[in-house]
Amino acid sequence: MSTQQDLRERRRQRLRFQLRRKGGGRPRLSVFRSGKNIYAQVIDDVAGRTLAAASSLDKALREQLKTGADSDAAVAVGKLVAERAVAAGVSLVVFDRGSYMYHGRIKALAEAAREGGLAF
C-alpha cells in the first residue's frame, strides 16, 4: 500500500512530466511551501540554473510580514519573484505547483506573479 508521501511524490512527478512535455522549453515557476514559509523560483531546466528566486525569508519581506505562512506572504513572494524574473528578462513561464493543490497560498502566489508581469 502506498503511503501519503509516495502518493505526493507520484503526483509531483506526473505534473513535472506534463510540464516538460507541454512547456515548450519555457522556464518554470516552481513553488515550495512549508508550515512556516513559502518559496518560489524561476528555473531554466535546459541550462540547469535558477534565473530568479524569492521567499518569505528575504530580508525585504521579513520586515513587512507578520508571518511567512499565510496568503499575504504568498502574495508578497509572488510579486517579488515576478519582479526579479522580469528584471532577468523572463516573462513567459510554466507554473509548477508541485504536489500542492491550486488553492490558498499557491493560488495567491500564482495570481500575484501574474499581476507582477509573468505570463502562464
UniProtKB/Swiss-Prot annotation:
Q: One of this protein's GO BP terms? A: translation
- Which UniProt key words apply to this protein? Ribonucleoprotein, Ribosomal protein, RNA-binding, rRNA-binding
- InterPro entries linked: Ribosomal_uL18_bac-type, Ribosomal_uL18_bac/euk
UniProt-recorded Gene Ontology molecular function terms: 5S rRNA binding; structural constituent of ribosome
Protein's UniProt keywords contain Thylakoid = no
State the GO CC annotations: cytosolic large ribosomal subunit
Q: Which domain of life is it from?
A: Bacteria
Q: Give the Gene3D superfamilies listed for this entry.
A: 3.30.420.100
A Pfam match is: Ribosomal_L18p
How is the quaternary structure described?
Part of the 50S ribosomal subunit; part of the 5S rRNA/L5/L18/L25 subcomplex. Contacts the 5S and 23S rRNAs.
Which PANTHER family has this protein been placed in?
39S RIBOSOMAL PROTEIN L18, MITOCHONDRIAL, LARGE RIBOSOMAL SUBUNIT PROTEIN UL18M
Free-text function comment from the UniProt entry: This is one of the proteins that bind and probably mediate the attachment of the 5S RNA into the large ribosomal subunit, where it forms part of the central protuberance.
* Similarity comment: Belongs to the universal ribosomal protein uL18 family.
UniProt-recorded name of the protein: Large ribosomal subunit protein uL18
| Source organism per UniProt | Gluconacetobacter diazotrophicus (strain ATCC 49037 / DSM 5601 / CCUG 37298 / CIP 103539 / LMG 7603 / PAl5)
- The gene behind this protein is rplR
